[in-house]
Amino acid sequence: MRLHHLLLVLLFLVLSAGSGFTQVVRNPQSCRWNMGVCIPISCPGNMRQIGTCFGPRVPCCRRW
């Protein structure tokens, strides 16, 4: 029975950890949460796009 509980806990940890990697930056709050900045033009040379802020035209940029 202890093994059953251990496997259940491991399954929960694997599923909960995987859900964080599938989230996409789509609004200003999640952009700031991911250490990004909303820039109304394309990202500068020292930054890369990690998502969008207000639709497809405003990128969320973060430093490399």
From Swiss-Prot:
GO biological process: one example: cell chemotaxis
Keyword Secreted: yes
UniProt entry tagged with the keyword Signal: yes
Disulfide bonds: 31-60, 38-53, 43-61
Signal peptide as annotated in the record: 1-22
Intracellular or extracellular location(s): Secreted
Molecular function GO labels: CCR6 chemokine receptor binding; chemoattractant activity
Keywords: Antibiotic, Antimicrobial, Defensin, Disulfide bond, Pyrrolidone carboxylic acid, Secreted, Signal
Tissue: Neutrophilic granules. Alveolar macrophages.
Pfam families tied to this protein: Defensin_beta
List of residues that carry Pyrrolidone carboxylic acid: 23
InterPro entries attached to this UniProt entry: Beta/alpha-defensin_C, Defensin_beta-like
Superkingdom, taxonomy of origin: Eukaryota
Chief site of localization: secreted
Xref: Gene3D superfamilies: Antimicrobial Peptide, Beta-defensin 2, Chain A
Family of the protein in this entry: Belongs to the beta-defensin family.
Described purpose of this protein according to its UniProt entry: Has bactericidal activity. Active against E.coli ML35 but not against S.aureus 502A.
Official protein name in the record: Beta-defensin 5
Species whose genome carries this gene: Bos taurus
